[in-house]
């Protein structure tokens, strides 16, 4: 089983500085210079990959198939550092579930649950 080394409670954390490329202004549209919700989701997905993919058998990766309960709770300005933590909550065959939180300092700025499936790198 390609997920044999994974278990509930396994986790990863990433820290990322918010840049213009991650902001609501990334496409030249006027608005606040803050982390966009699509970028927050991207960081959450990257963190879940860090919690999983390095521990899979060779030839396997994960792909996302669901995001539930995504809430962007507070704005985060360009230059601020966001810390994202993904914790595996369930491993069911090739399906993996995560609880994810994002923080700026001590303030929670986002939460979600995420689900990924393990597939072979050739797509099977």
For the regions a protein language model found, what residue spans apply to each?
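Catalytic strand-loop segment that frames the active site of acyl-thioester-processing enzymes
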Residues: 2-37
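HotDog/MaoC-like acyl-thioester-processing domains
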Residues: 8, 78, 87-124
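Generic structural detector for well-ordered beta-strands
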Residues: 15-19, 71, 115-117
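Hydrophobic beta-strand-centered segment that forms part of the acyl-chain substrate-binding groove
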Residues: 49-83
């Amino acid at each position: 089983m390609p997920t044999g080394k994974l278990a509930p409670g396994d986790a990863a954390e990433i820290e990322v500085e918010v840049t213009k490329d991650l902001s609501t202004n990334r496409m030249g549209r006027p608005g606040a210079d803050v982390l966009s919700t699509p970028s927050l989701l991207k960081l959450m997905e990257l963190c879940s990959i860090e919690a999983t993919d390095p521990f899979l058998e060779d030839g396997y990766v994960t792909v996302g198939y669901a995001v539930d309960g995504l809430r962007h709770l507070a704005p985060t300005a360009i230059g601020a550092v966001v810390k994202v933590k993904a914790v595996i909550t369930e491993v069911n065959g090739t399906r993996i579930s995560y609880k994810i939180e994002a923080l700026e300092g001590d303030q929670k700025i986002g939460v979600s649950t995420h689900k990924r499936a393990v597939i072979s790198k050739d797509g099977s």
